Amino acid sequence: PEVVGTMGQLPSGSIDLIQNEDEAKKYLNKEGKKIAFVTQTTLSVDDTQEMIKILKKRFPEIREPFKEDICYATTNRQMAVKNIAKKCDMFFIIGSRNSSNSVRLVEVAKKSGCINSQLIHSKSIIPYDQIKNSNIIGISSGASAPEILVENFIHNLKNRFTITIDEVEIIKENVVFRICLLYTSPSPRDPIG
């Protein structure tokens, strides 16, 4: 929706959408006009950097934003997930399936070494059987996910397992984005009762 909204602000044909490295390699400045780029604020920082490198190499005169246009919350969360995922048996991103930020965070966790990473958009899909066999679990959320969803997820785990929460701070900000590592062991309580 963000890209569609931006493209709709200008006359048809005045903006070209480049969605991946292959499209960046094939892009043609048909009319030889001055060109510039902007990026969707919730894209993967790493993926965006590669596309930008390709465009800059092909079009040295290309204009770019005066400052980083990836949302700082997105950048910081991706950096935190990247840093922590390699230590985890499982990684959960709490967020919506239609949130590109949340979906990208799952991709970042997988690329960073935690293959068993997944998006949790509903209590009904929490994989408790897999969690009970894990020692270290990473948790983060999409930028627009309310903190209460993360708290509810952790509460659900506490009801089934004995856990230790270790909040990891990667970057000091005025706005806090908590990333948790959970150390699990089976809870003596009946998970149903």
Segment roles from a protein language model:
Residues P1-S141, E147-I148, N152-S185:
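The feature marks the mature, well-folded catalytic cores of soluble enzymes
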Residues Y183-G193:
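Single conserved hydrophobic/aromatic residue that forms the stacking wall/gate
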